[in-house]
Amino acid sequence: VIECQCFLLSVFIRNGDLVCRNQIFSSTAGTTTISDIVKSLESGKTVIIDTSRLMTQAELLIGSMIAGNTFWRYQKYKSEGVLEDKPIVSVVIEEAPRVLGSDSLQSGDNIYSTIAKEGRKFKIGLIAITQLTSVIPKEILANLNTKIILGNEMATERRAVIESACQDLSSDDQAISSLDIGEAIVSSTFTKFAVPVHFPKFDDLINLDAKEKKPEKIIFR
């Protein structure tokens, strides 16, 4: 089992030392990396973890370590009465069924399901991205207060989305299936009715921002 886990995490032992093929894990460096990331989140910064070079198991391990450390620290702040001074933290997880699917939760809750259920008490939210809503337990879906519904051609998944929506979308099955790129329906406990929205293309938005941004002034004294 240990050898299997080492393979999945791309680590092995060489001359008694821990070696990582993708240079992510180390026995001598990075002792404050997770703490530094959490501190950045506490200061209101956006932190993006690039896991494109990692296998799924390593990616989920790193994400769980960061999310867990943040959650436990915010729990501590609440008990100390200083949580109100901290910014809200949102944890984004892609391919959410990997950690929120029924199969993943057979042996009990993990940090992601815990945040989904209890995070709001500690100013931590979960943004779960998935095309397969049907494999996520209804208990978890019920705790996600806002759903941004994109187009989906799979009838099973549309039914799961409609059943978990905060408003009655039973007559919107066809509308959901025909949503185009950039179009969505927002269903939330914070709105009285579902709201259709349109998102601009990210590349166009960035290019527009770059054109409008004035060059920085340099003053020599």
Where are these regions (language model features)?
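Conserved ATP-driven motor cores of ASCE-family P-loop NTPases powering translocation/secretion/packaging/pilus
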Residues: 108, 114-200
